[in-house]
């Protein structure tokens, strides 16, 4: 009987320590994940371009201003060419006051990018959509609401960047975001931002794009070694890990900065991604 009690006590201790770790350690220690991306579509003008991708801040839920300040500093140390944010700036359950709005505008405006900064809405943002849009605009982000932008290189190279609004709230309009590509074949490298990664197949089935960047899944906020993600949200059931190659398209999914639903992360620290985009050498 004593052995059984000992086992129970040990199990309880392990559970308590795991919960404490997931709450306080797992949600800390920001990581930068670096990926080289190769494509023969990359124009010479943009060979080696650096793109920072961060997502799912879920402000005011297990994330402090000090952590956001650190993220901004880390991004600026890299000196990115392009910065993209793929949604869920503010957690839907958070209460936001004017001081929070001023802080986010001021702090996110400090992120520097050589060419431009872009953002799309996530499903959590629709509870405060006007506030989030206002923050994006005042912080110097181009808000891509089923729209696109083109970055021009010095020698006629073109990068197309499109943003599709949240699929979860049925705000997506793929035609408005991407129809330009069907009539304009002179675009070199094509990037799409969409919060929910499962929508990637819809895009790829209709349009030829090179790179899709998403968030939403947090790569499975709670992960177990050899098992993987224990839970992923709707619209991130098929695609939720860090990377997928679908036909000729690269899909990268950020694990995010904040937390959603539960204030825990296990074997999955907060992170943002750095992509170095290279022109693939063909023989």
Language-model segments: what does each one mean?
Residues 48-58, 157-167, 191-194, 250-255:
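Active-site-proximal beta-strand elements of phosphoester/diester hydrolases
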Residues 81-82, 118, 141-142, 159, ...:
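Short, Asp-centered acidic motifs that coordinate Mg2+ and/or phosphate
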